[in-house]
């Protein structure tokens, strides 16, 4: 069979991990059971990224809008985050993955932030793979935050208004050193971005699967990478992208 792959493995994969609630509902279980089951999919995907050679994995774990959910669900999600850090830290070491977080981190309970900080510090030395958790994250919030930082620099006289260009905005995002996602995967079928990485996804390839997040396994991830490999990324031009 002819291999018509035109793209190499994506350097950065971002995932909207959706469908935990529906997965639980189908089983007659409380929503939190779906979130619990989703933790296993996170482990699977971290390992699959390492095996495939994906350098950056950004997971949408909690949006600024998700604070509007019932308190019991929000509290449960925060507890799960702490548990995930406790249970999975050793796997991050085994896979040599550096943990990062992006979002409005001041919103997070101290107990969550402490556990994230602990794992971030201990994994800070790994350079091959990075896991970026988007927590209390909103794309509009991030861009507004960047605008505020830029305004402060202009006010302080360290930046001229005519120097505010795309590179300047990009430099004031939460994690300016991370390349933009090449591939965005969304599970459980919704065809929307839901305020995720609005700036960074401008030229990402989108892949939506009907599979709910707790059922997402390595073959599903592989299928997304295979699909990506055959996309024609033109970036507004007319020639297929030259191999990087
Ligand atoms: C995604 O699953 C996880 C979070 C948003 C934290 P949902 O909880 O949104 O599941 P559905 O979309 O209701 O099925
Ligand atoms: C997006 O899922 C947020 C996360 C996966 C953390 P949502 O379930 O919150 O998004 P909507 O409400 O379907 O747009
Ligand atoms: Mg959802």
Regions found by a protein language model. Give the residues of each.
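Flexible, compositionally biased loop and terminal segments
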Residues: 1-244
